[in-house]
């Protein structure tokens, strides 16, 4: 407990240093203790801390939530209208798209609420309450109820959350759930209550030529001209409570929505972002950074690059395949390019040298303090990393090929149950398992899967995997490839993809009419899947064993670093919980002789136009609006149409769609990307280079109003001019 009290002092105390671009994805619940509002006001904030986060009344926090499974969205009207990124809504847009109704290409604009499209599976979550449960966790450790290392485990955290929810006044209320999570590497724990709405409908989305303008080429780059937005709406029951889709549901009367500023932005203006950053690793050692580069990023880059080449070719040849694989390709290429940029930025920004300097400083601090745990922790981390490096490399290769690459497979565990039922002549069990298999077949051959495309992916990835890993990291079916197919990967893949029970409807229907043990045992894809999962278990167990004790080592190291840097407060790593980052609108100089100003305009879209490149096609209607200078009240004072802008805010994946808010608490943009030069930012923040790329809210409203013809949406927003 003494160690924890020292950490609290390190986290809560603040040295009032000169204002600067601020590193940190800050916890809202620690704003008062860390005196963040004082620093924010020094940079231009005109609100009080209570206006941003107040557990006892409505605040800005109540206008921000989790959109889908990994993005942020904000409420922009009293009637539950959500603004998020186009790439966040991309899966939903694709879900509603077909060759006949190609909303990816053409965009979608609901002209009335009756036209808003229900989107099964899409959810929006608000943070209802945040509770510090650190003392409860520490007391459980102290009493022997749980071991310290177990406090990081899912089972413990789930049980704790369930216990706390059951004892809470929120228990039993519609849509309420709770999650317990470690912060500061397990030196603090918070319980977060969420309220989930599951009737979320698609309202508006620009064509991909606007919402994804620049495509893969411009991803992570500046200057940027992407109008990366989409609009949805939350529906609830008559009492405003969460409910599954029902035609009688009504738009949510939001507790809080963001006013929208058309007043514009200037260099140096205050800007803050509230959202749900997914993951950062700012407290890594030098050896851990090297591991990220070589055991994770490098194999990901190589394997995804090969798969994406296959998908790109197939998508270009078929509109059906393009729509089916649009979301998968975008998700894959996003972190493929991120990994390339991260490795480059680690070298260019001398992150390894920075980490080495930090470790030397920490060693001196530990020695002066006489803390033996601190003195040995880095060397203990390094030893574990050295042991785990080859295992993590193999595991990354496995996951990229067999979990994120090749999709086709069979449910071997269900087939095993069916086989037992057939042997036992248990008709009830046979019928039950066949009904389950019917659902699985439909899941495999879903509308976003093409068997022939996946076959080509498998033919590309299986030999690549064999080339990249040692023999002991190969699934058993590689022996079959060598022995029965003389090393011919294409022939093996064709055998599996043609002759499995699950290959096609004809094979499947033939099997379920007369299921036999022999057919199950001879199924080539089932043998493939069984071998795949056997290897996954082996690699997973090896990796877990090699990293044993690492959580506690990190806990010690982070505690020590916070003490070393005290009284300067430190923010915990991101873990997809609500955070605040503050800074300013700011240009930057990426290299000698190059200056990037803080904003772009629609003129740049026209300059980038290339009708022969699908990433840089400009819709005819947008060109007409540009040539007519029909920008209305959304234009800059000089008549130009603003597009995107830069801030010094500290963001990462998960922040996509987050509101960029000015000093008055008004919406000025939506964050959607980071810049290429700072892709090492998840590991080491660089004040000079780190930039958030946001779409200007005026560009968003211009597209909704003038191109989409949805003035009725503008009318329900609160506009400040």
UniProtKB/Swiss-Prot annotation:
Pfam families: Peptidase_S46. One of its GO terms (biological process) is peptide catabolic process. InterPro entries: Pep_S46, Peptidase_S1_PA, Peptidase_S1_PA_chymotrypsin. The record marks 674 as: Critical for substrate specificity of DPP7. Gene3D superfamilies: Trypsin-like serine proteases (2.40.10.10). The keyword Protease applies. Residues 1-21 form the signal peptide. The active site is at 87 (charge relay system), 228 (charge relay system), 656 (charge relay system). The keyword Hydrolase applies. Its EC number is 3.4.14.-. Keywords: Aminopeptidase, Hydrolase, Protease, Serine protease, Signal. GO terms for molecular function: dipeptidyl-peptidase activity; serine-type aminopeptidase activity. PANTHER family: PERIPLASMIC PEPTIDASE SUBFAMILY S1B (PTHR38469:SF1). Catalyzes the removal of dipeptides from the N-terminus of oligopeptides. Most potently cleaves the synthetic substrate Met-Leu-methylcoumaryl-7-amide (Met-Leu-MCA), followed by Leu-Arg-MCA, while this enzyme does not hydrolyze Gly-Arg-, Gly-Gly-, Lys-Lys-, or Gly-Pro-MCA. Belongs to the peptidase S46 family. This is Dipeptidyl-peptidase 7. It comes from Phocaeicola vulgatus (strain ATCC 8482 / DSM 1447 / JCM 5826 / CCUG 4940 / NBRC 14291 / NCTC 11154).
């Amino acid at each position: 407990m003494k160690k924890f009290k020292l950490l609290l002092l390190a986290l809560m105390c603040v040295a009032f240093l000169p204002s600067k671009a601020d590193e940190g994805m800050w916890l809202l619940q620690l704003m008062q203790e860390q005196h963040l509002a004082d620093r924010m006001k020094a940079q231009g904030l005109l609100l009080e801390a209570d206006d941003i986060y107040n557990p006892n009344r409505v605040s800005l926090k109540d206008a921000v939530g989790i959109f889908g499974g990994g993005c942020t969205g904000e409420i922009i009207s009293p009637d539950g209208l959500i603004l998020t990124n186009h790439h966040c809504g991309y899966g939903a847009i694709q879900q509603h798209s077909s060759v006949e109704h190609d909303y990816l290409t053409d965009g979608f604009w609901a002209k009335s609420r009756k036209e808003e499209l229900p989107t099964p599976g899409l959810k929006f979550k608000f943070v209802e309450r945040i509770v510090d449960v650190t003392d409860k966790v520490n007391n459980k450790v102290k009493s022997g109820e749980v071991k310290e290392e177990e406090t990081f485990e899912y089972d413990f955290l789930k049980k704790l959350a369930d216990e706390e929810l059951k004892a809470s006044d929120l228990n039993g209320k519609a849509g309420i759930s709770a999650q317990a999570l470690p912060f500061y590497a397990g030196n603090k724990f918070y319980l977060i209550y969420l309220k989930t709405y599951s009737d979320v409908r698609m309202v508006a989305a620009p064509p991909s030529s606007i919402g994804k303008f620049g495509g893969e080429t411009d991803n992570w780059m500046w200057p940027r001209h992407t109008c990366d937005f989409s609009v949805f709406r939350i529906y609830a029951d008559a009492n405003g409570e969460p409910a599954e889709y029902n035609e009688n549901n009504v738009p949510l009367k939001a507790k809080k929505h963001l006013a929208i500023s058309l007043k514009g932005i200037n260099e140096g203006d205050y800007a803050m972002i509230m959202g749900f950053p997914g993951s950062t690793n700012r407290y890594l050692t030098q050896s851990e950074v090297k591991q990220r580069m070589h055991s994770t990023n490098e194999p990901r880059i190589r394997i995804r690059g090969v798969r994406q080449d296959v998908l790109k070719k197939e998508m270009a040849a078929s509109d059906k395949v393009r729509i089916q694989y649009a979301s998968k390709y975008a998700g894959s290429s996003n972190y493929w390019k991120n990994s390339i940029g991260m490795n480059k930025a680690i070298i260019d920004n001398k992150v390894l040298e920075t980490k080495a300097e930090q470790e030397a400083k920490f060693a001196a601090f530990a020695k002066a303090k006489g803390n033996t745990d601190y003195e040995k922790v880095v060397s203990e981390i390094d030893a574990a990393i050295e042991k785990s490096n080859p295992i993590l490399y193999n595991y990354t290769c496995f996951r990229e090929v067999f979990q994120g690459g090749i999709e086709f497979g069979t449910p071997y565990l269900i087939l095993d149950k069916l086989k037992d039922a057939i042997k036992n002549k248990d008709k009830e069990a046979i019928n039950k398992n066949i009904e389950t298999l019917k659902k699985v077949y439909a899941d495999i051959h879903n509308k976003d899967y093409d068997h022939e495309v996946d076959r080509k992916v498998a033919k590309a990835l299986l030999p690549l995997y064999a080339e990249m890993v040692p023999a002991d990291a190969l699934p058993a079916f590689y022996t079959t490839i060598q022995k029965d197919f003389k090393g011919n990967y294409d022939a093996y893949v064709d055998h599996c993809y043609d002759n499995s029970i699950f290959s096609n409807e004809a094979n499947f229907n033939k099997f379920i009419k007369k299921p036999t043990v022999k057919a199950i045992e001879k199924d080539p894809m089932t043998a493939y899947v069984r071998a795949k999962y056997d290897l996954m278990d082996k690699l997973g167990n090896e990796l877990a064993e090699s990293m044993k004790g690492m959580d506690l080592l990190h806990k010690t190291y982070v505690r020590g670093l916070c003490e070393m840097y005290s009284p300067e407060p430190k923010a915990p790593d991101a873990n997809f919980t609500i955070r605040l980052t503050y800074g300013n609108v700011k240009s930057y100089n990426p290299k000698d002789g190059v200056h990037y100003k803080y904003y772009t305009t629609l003129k740049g879209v026209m300059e980038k136009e290339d009708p022969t490149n699908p990433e840089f096609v400009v819709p005819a209607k947008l060109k007409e609006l540009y040539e007519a200078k029909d920008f209305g009240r959304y234009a800059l004072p000089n008549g130009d149409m603003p597009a995107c802008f830069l801030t010094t805010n500290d963001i990462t994946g998960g922040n996509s769609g987050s509101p960029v808010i000015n000093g008055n608490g008004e919406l000025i943009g939506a964050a959607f990307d980071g810049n290429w030069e700072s892709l090492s930012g998840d590991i080491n923040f660089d004040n000079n280079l780190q930039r958030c790329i946001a779409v200007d809210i005026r560009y968003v409203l211009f597209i909704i109003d003038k191109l989409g013809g949805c003035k009725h949406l503008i009318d329900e927003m609160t506009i400040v001019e």
